[in-house]
A protein has these predicted regions:
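N-terminal, positively charged/glycine-rich alpha-helical extensions of SAM-dependent methyltransferases
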Residues: 2-37
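Class I SAM-dependent methyltransferase Rossmann-like catalytic core
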Residues: 31-49
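Conserved alpha-helix/loop element of class I SAM-dependent methyltransferases that forms part
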Residues: 47-63
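Class I SAM-dependent methyltransferase "Motif I" SAM/SAH-binding loop
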Residues: 70-72
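Class I SAM-dependent methyltransferase SAM/SAH-binding core
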Residues: 75, 79-116
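Short conserved loop adjoining the S-adenosyl-L-methionine
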Residues: 116-122
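A short SAM/SAH-binding and catalytic strip from SAM-dependent methyltransferases
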Residues: 127-138
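S-adenosyl-L-methionine-dependent methyltransferase catalytic module, highlighting the catalytic core
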Residues: 141-146, 153-243
């Protein structure tokens, strides 16, 4: 795969701010109409909910040292230890999830990512994983910085809140989205920092971070990231490193 740069080449800028007066509103209405029509099509969904684990497993070298931040019940780390022979370490704040990790035989530390990773030396791990955790953190930028301090590479995945179904709910229905993959209302969701693909690329470009590779979930199927995926991607996974 051709290595994309971290300078917005993955998502093109459309220059809407420079349109003639009234043209922006016209184009915005056209986009909403198109998105409404597409939103009527059922999403295939991802039956397993584990598409990211397949890609993460491929991206991690055999025998690598791996730190999984917000490791949940330890499912991913258990798989990586078994299939990729990694030296794994999980970090999780939820006591019940920590017990699940212990039951699986997965090494785990109970800790709050918001407190930082001061206990971990620089470049102590080959890969640091942040799977479906970033949007739930109080200080996501600080955790991203820590991820790239303690790891040679990072793998980050998150729901794309610029997906067209989300935009339709917000613009056309004035409602926060509730989907099969995100079945929680705004007052019970753990997602406190809503992130988009473009926002992640902006952070990378401004922080000296290179996007090594990228993948998306579109209509229930995973594939490599394309330049026009900012509205199509339901979920995003990127591999990053310091430029």
């Amino acid at each position: 795969m051709t290595q994309p740069r971290a300078d917005h080449n993955l998502v093109t800028d459309r220059g809407l701010a420079h349109l003639p007066e009234g043209e922006f509103e016209k184009r915005a209405a056209e986009v909403v109409a198109l998105m409404k029509a597409r939103a009527q099509r059922p999403s295939n969904g991802d039956p397993s909910g584990r598409w990211q684990e397949e890609i993460i497993s491929r991206e991690i070298p055999l025998g690598a040292s791996v730190l999984d931040l917000g490791c949940g019940d330890g499912f991913l780390l258990e798989r990586l230890i078994r299939e990729r022979n990694v030296r794994g370490q999980g970090v999780e704040i939820d006591p019940d999830q920590v017990f699940s990790c212990v039951d699986r035989g997965v090494p785990v530390i109970q800790a709050d990512l918001g407190a930082g990773l001061r206990w971990c030396p620089d470049k102590a791990f080959d890969v640091v994983v942040l799977e479906e955790t970033l949007q739930t953190l109080q200080s996501p930028r600080e955790v991203l910085e820590e991820m790239l301090r303690v790891g040679k590479r990072g793998i980050v995945s998150f729901p794309n809140f610029a997906h067209f179904r989300v935009v339709v709910d917000l613009v056309a229905r004035s409602r926060m989205p509730v989907t099969p993959r995100r079945p929680f209302y705004w007052y019970e969701s753990a997602n406190i920092h809503l992130l988009t693909l473009r926002a992640l690329l902006d952070w990378a470009a401004g922080s000296g971070v290179r996007i090594v590779s990228g993948y998306v979930l579109v209509d229930g199927a995973s594939r490599e990231l394309r330049p026009d995926d900012d509205l199509l991607a339901e979920e995003v996974l990127v591999v990053v490193e310091r430029a």
